[in-house]
Amino acid sequence: MKIRRIELFNLGPYIDKNIFDINCNRERHIVLIGGKNGAGKTTFFKAIKTCLYGCKVWGFEAPGKEYFRQMASFVNSRMQFDSHIKAYVEVELEFDDGKQINYFVLHREWYRIKKGLEEKFLICKNGCELDRESSIDFSNYLLSIIPPDMFNFYFFDGESIADFFLGSDGSRNFRNAFLKLYGLDTLSLMVENFARALKRSGNSSN
């Protein structure tokens, strides 16, 4: 998987359309994003994660009132005063399976309604919009190849990477990301469940 393009529209300090072409090759495959404090580096990374994973990035299993409250502070402040202004993040991905190269565009958009914000999420494959079922399948596939915890190994900012690795939860973060990447998180959960079952069985026999 390769990220080719990122587009931010009215998110944080980004006003109107901002396009980042980060298409790389084998010789030049690391992209550095620089800027002064407050220029929008953290917003840039947070927007990419939100586009790919949605509310899960913000700690929610499904979009709800609290999620949209946080998103209201994430989008550009102009949306508070003009109901016609929208905000979105769009990410273009390239997948090469060895036989064919496919291009996916993920578009996550927020717009105002009377009670706050509403979200719209679209996925296009090679220029054609996917239906709801195909979009869910692709989102699940994306979660399987790069879980949100693993995202920090590929996209990180200098202010948070030290906390991710060296903070109080650093070891757990690394362990969880590794298990999810290799599909071992289910096995680990099974081992823990068996251990608890054996412990209960031992206690009941006593």
Regions found by a protein language model. Give the residues of each.
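Short glycine-/polar-rich loops that comprise or flank the Walker A/P-loop
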Residues: K2, H84-V89, G116-K120, D149-N152, ...
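Pre-Walker A-like glycine/lysine-rich segment at the N-terminus of P-loop NTPase domains
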Residues: K2-Y53, F178
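Beta-strand secondary-structure signal
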Residues: R5-E7, Y88-E92, V105-H107
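Conserved P-loop NTP-binding catalytic core
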Residues: V31-G34, F45-N102
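Conserved NTP-handling cores and scaffolds of large molecular machines
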Residues: I48, L52-K56, I146-M150, L181-L189, ...
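Short, solvent-exposed secondary-structure capping/transition elements
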Residues: K56-V57, K99-Y103, G116, T186-E192
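Glycine-rich phosphate-binding loops of NTPases
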Residues: E61-A72, K99-F153, D163-A177
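Extended, Lys/Glu-rich alpha-helical coiled-coil stalks
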Residues: G158-N206
